[in-house]
C-alpha cells in the first residue's frame, strides 16, 4: 500500500478547469488574438465585419469595447486563484507573507525592467505599467484576503468602489470643479502628473497614466471580485448552483454597472468600472 507521502507525490495538483479555460481565453487576446481575428474578418467579406473589428480596438475615453475588458479580466483571474493559493500556506503565516511579498516585488521589478529600467535613463522611465499594477493589486488584495473572510472581502470591495467614486465625484483638482471626468480635468490624472515618479508618456493616456496612482484602488476591487468568485467555486455548493450563482452575480453586476454609469461614466483608463 502506498504511503501518504507517495500518494501526495504521485497525485497531480488539482486544477480548476474553468479558471484555466478563462485564463487561456484571456491570454489568447493578450498575445495578439485581435490581429488574427482582424485578418480573419477581413477575409470573410461579411457586412458586420467592420463593426466586429471595432470591438478589437480600445475606446478612446468614455465607454468600453470588448478589448477594454481583457486586462480587467486578467485581474479578475488573479483574484480567482487567491482562495486556492493562499490556503496552501494558512498554517504558516510567515510563509503567506513571504509569498505575497515575493510575488509582488517580482512583478513590479519585471514591469520596470520591461519599461527600460536597465537603460538607467530614469528621467525617461515609465514607472507605472501593467505588470506593476498586477503585482500591487495582487499584493493588496491578498493581504485583505489573509486577514478577513468572505464577508470582510465584500465589505472591502464595497468600501473601495464607493470610496473611489466619492473621491472622483466630490474632490476637485486645484482650479477645477468636482466631478470632472474629462481627460484633462479628472483627479486621477492630476495626481499622476504631480506625484507619480518617472515620465508620463502620451501613449499611456498622456494627462496621467492609465495604470497610475488613484486608479489602482478600483483595480484592487477587480481582484477582490475575482477572489469572491474563486471562494464560491471552492465552496461545497453543487456544480449547477455554482453556475447559477456566478451567472446571477454577473447579470446583477452588469445591471448595477450600467445604472451606476449614468452618474459615474464608464472610463476604462480611469478604472471607473470593475
Describe each model-derived feature in a short phrase:
Residues 36-64, 116-124, 204, 255, ...:
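Juxtamembrane/transmembrane-helix boundary motifs at the membrane-water interface
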Residues 32-35, 108-117, 161-170, 250-261:
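Aromatic-anchored segments of alpha-helical transmembrane domains
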Residues 2-91, 95-96:
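N-terminal signal-anchor module of multipass membrane proteins
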Residues 273-274:
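Conserved small/polar residues in nucleotide/adenosyl-binding loops
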Residues 80-83, 137, 141, 145, ...:
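Hydrophobic transmembrane alpha-helices
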Amino acid at each position: 500500500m502506498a504511503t501518504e507521502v507517495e500518494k501526495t507525490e504521485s497525485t497531480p495538483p488539482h486544477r480548476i478547469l474553468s479558471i484555466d479555460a478563462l485564463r487561456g481565453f484571456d491570454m489568447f487576446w493578450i498575445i495578439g488574438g485581435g490581429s488574427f481575428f482582424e485578418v480573419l474578418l477581413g477575409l470573410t467579406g461579411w457586412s458586420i465585419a467592420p463593426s466586429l473589428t471595432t470591438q478589437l480596438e480600445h475606446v478612446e475615453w468614455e465607454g468600453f469595447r470588448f478589448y477594454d475588458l481583457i486586462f480587467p479580466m486578467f485581474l479578475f483571474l488573479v483574484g480567482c486563484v487567491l482562495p486556492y493559493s493562499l490556503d496552501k500556506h494558512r498554517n504558516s503565516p510567515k510563509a503567506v507573507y513571504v509569498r505575497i511579498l515575493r510575488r509582488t516585488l517580482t512583478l513590479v521589478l519585471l514591469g520596470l525592467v520591461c519599461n527600460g529600467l536597465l537603460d538607467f535613463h530614469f528621467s525617461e522611465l515609465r514607472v507605472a505599467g501593467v505588470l506593476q499594477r498586477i503585482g500591487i493589486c495582487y499584493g493588496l488584495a491578498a493581504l485583505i484576503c489573509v486577514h478577513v473572510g468572505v464577508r470582510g472581502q465584500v465589505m472591502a470591495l464595497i468600501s473601495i468602489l464607493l470610496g473611489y467614486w466619492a473621491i472622483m465625484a466630490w474632490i476637485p483638482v486645484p482650479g477645477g470643479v468636482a466631478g470632472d471626468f474629462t481627460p484633462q480635468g479628472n483627479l486621477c490624472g492630476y495626481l499622476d502628473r504631480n506625484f507619480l515618479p518617472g515620465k508620463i508618456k502620451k501613449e499611456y493616456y498622456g494627462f496621467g497614466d492609465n495604470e497610475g496612482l488613484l486608479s489602482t484602488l478600483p483595480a484592487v476591487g477587480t481582484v477582490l471580485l475575482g477572489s469572491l468568485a474563486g471562494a464560491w467555486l471552492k465552496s461545497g455548493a453543487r456544480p449547477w448552483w455554482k453556475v447559477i450563482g456566478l451567472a446571477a452575480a454577473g447579470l446583477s453586476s452588469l445591471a448595477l454597472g450600467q445604472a451606476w454609469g449614468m452618474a459615474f461614466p464608464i472610463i476604462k483608463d480611469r478604472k471607473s468600472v470593475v
